[in-house]
A protein has these predicted regions:
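Short alpha-helix boundary/capping elements
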Residues: 398, 444, 448-452, 507-511
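Intracellular, membrane-proximal regulatory regions of polytopic membrane proteins
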Residues: 421-490, 496-498
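Transmembrane helical cores of multi-pass secondary ion antiporters/exchangers
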Residues: 1-410, 414-417, 425, 466-470, ...
Length: 518
């Protein structure tokens, strides 16, 4: 199949899988990987050839930039030291701990006996990058404390950059470009520091350029240039492109998406980046499923389990150590959160990009790809599917069944009130007799009274969920205002200038609500 047709087919498959996964309430990424495995096993579609340049230069920048523009600098600043501890020492320790568990045991296993420290660190860095997108989405749904969500999101974004830098340095050791640990430490701080500097400059220039713009196409173009430009410029200068894109995204999100940018343009731009991230994630998970060697995965399943538990143990050591370090300070967080930070740190797209980016000539490529794929798959299946019960067990969230029951009762109330309105309309139009209307109203009113009693008992006693309900209701009312405003413009009651000014005002209120619920 030609390259272009293969990509088109993958997008069609991703769309179908997304719809199906939503209907059966299955995490989208798990469904994509499963479909990719089936397609690869049946040889229904050959995976397009992926080079390191394609994976790094095309896939990474939008994934990193989209995550960065949604983070608030104030939230990161408030918990900067715990986040920084998880991101730099945490990722380094996690990488080393994973390698330290793998290598000694691997010496006694035929498939892993030749594994050395450089290759072990390469694997450790690949699985140190967390991808908790599905978990954070569930957090919002279940009313998990905002500070825990911020810790999870911020740490994930920033540790991606650290993991990639360590991965690159480990590869430089294997390739012979670095020879001593001292050189590695100097190289680490050089590529990270200069990468952040490049990103700040690109982000600041983009923020200045987008101020007061009223053309959404130009804003989207400029942010696209910022995402790819920050990455490519940094890479050409020999520093970290990922750290550069992280910095550019944070600056654009903080300074570019301020009150100087029209709210409607801001919302459209954010929607564009959410779509791009969705598209890139979809392709990566499908391609990983297509690229995996199932026979090798089957042969290596004990080592995949070893790799998974090594990664999990390393993760819990890091988050527990961070909790202990900050427990005596005002930055402490509950011990229960360490379980969620450890268990919710799923592995995903970035880990697979790093594994796939290794050159075909590298002797351990198939081994690392298989181990990383197995670790990602186990993390999604074991941690991804169990995070909701774990949250409930720890008392951090309301159960999903409670939330659904609450939502269903409210929906039934709405439907019954609509039915009562319909009966009233039929009576006023003399389409049914007053007696029949009264009989029907009495019947439906009894149902409403019964559901109201159930609703009082079922109301989740979680402040965050009630706050979410309020935000959602306000948003719906504001969207109704937008629709009414458009009707006034469409029928000629108001001119375009008035319509645009009032629409921006309403969009500003919607955007403020989105931030309030973020």
């Amino acid at each position: 199949v030609p390259y272009e047709i293969a990509i088109l087919i993958l997008f069609v498959i991703a769309s179908v899988v997304a719809v199906a996964a939503r209907r059966i309430d299955l995490p989208y990424t798990i469904a994509l990987m499963a479909v990719g495995i089936v397609l690869g096993a049946l040889h229904l579609l050959n995976a397009p050839h992926l080079t390191q340049e394609l994976l790094y230069d095309i896939f990474l920048p939008p994934l990193i930039f989209e995550a960065a523009i949604h983070l608030k600098a104030d939230d990161i600043r408030r918990d900067f030291w715990p986040i920084a501890t998880l991101v730099v020492p945490g990722v380094i320790l996690s990488t080393l701990a994973t390698a330290a568990v793998m290598i000694p045991i691997g010496q006694h296993l035929p498939q892993l006996h030749a594994l050395n420290w450089a290759v072990g660190i390469l694997f450790g860095a690949a699985v140190a990058a967390t991808d908790p997108v599905a978990v954070v989405a569930l957090f919002k749904k279940l009313g998990v404390p905002q500070r825990l969500r911020v810790l999870m999101e911020s740490e994930s974004l920033l540790n991606d950059g650290t993991a990639i830098v360590i991965f690159t340095i480990a590869w430089a050791f294997i390739h012979g470009d670095l020879s001593t640990p001292q050189e590695a430490v100097i190289e680490f701080f050089r590529v990270v520091g200069l990468g952040l500097l490049v990103g700040v400059i690109v982000g600041f220039l983009t923020a200045v350029a987008t101020q007061n713009l009223d053309d959404v196409m130009i804003v989207i173009t400029l942010t696209t240039v910022a995402a790819y430009g920050s990455f490519l410029i940094a890479e050409r200068l020999g520093v970290s492109g990922v750290m550069s894109t992280v910095a550019a995204g944070l600056v654009v999100g903080q300074r570019g998406f301020t009150n100087t940018l029209f709210p409607s343009i801001r919302l459209t731009t954010e929607s564009f980046w959410e779509y791009i991230a969705f598209a890139m994630n979809s392709l990566i998970f499908l391609l990983m499923g297509l690229a995996i060697d199932l026979q090798m995965l089957w042969r290596l399943w004990p080592f995949v389990l070893l790799a998974y538990f090594s990664m999990l143990v390393a993760r819990f050591i890091v988050v527990t150590g961070t909790w202990g370090l900050f427990y005596p300070t005002r930055l402490r967080f509950p011990f229960r959160w360490t379980v969620i930070l450890g268990w919710g740190g799923l592995r995903g797209a970035l880990s697979m990009v790093l594994a796939l980016s290794l050159p075909e000539s590298f002797a351990y490529k198939n081994l690392i790809v298989t181990l990383v794929f197995g670790v990602v798959l186990l993390a999604l299946l074991i941690q991804g599917l169990s995070i909701s019960p774990v949250l409930r067990w720890l008392g951090i969230s309301t159960s999903l069944s409670e939330v659904r029951s609450y939502e269903q009762l409210k929906t039934r109330i709405t439907l019954l009130h609509n039915t009562m309105d319909a009966i009233d309309r039929l009576r006023r139009r003399h389409m049914i007799s007053a007696r029949s209307a009264q009989t029907l109203e009495d019947e439906f009113q009894k149902q409403i009274d019964g559901i109201l009693q159930e609703l009082q008992k079922a109301t989740p006693d979680k402040e965050a969920l009630l706050k979410e309900e309020l935000i959602r209701t306000k948003r719906r009312l504001l969207m109704d205002q937008k629709n009414d405003l458009f009707e006034l413009y469409r029928n000629g009651t108001i001119d375009y200038g008035t319509y645009e000014a009032l629409k921006n005002e309403i969009d500003g209120q919607i955007f403020a609500l989105e931030n309030e619920g973020a």
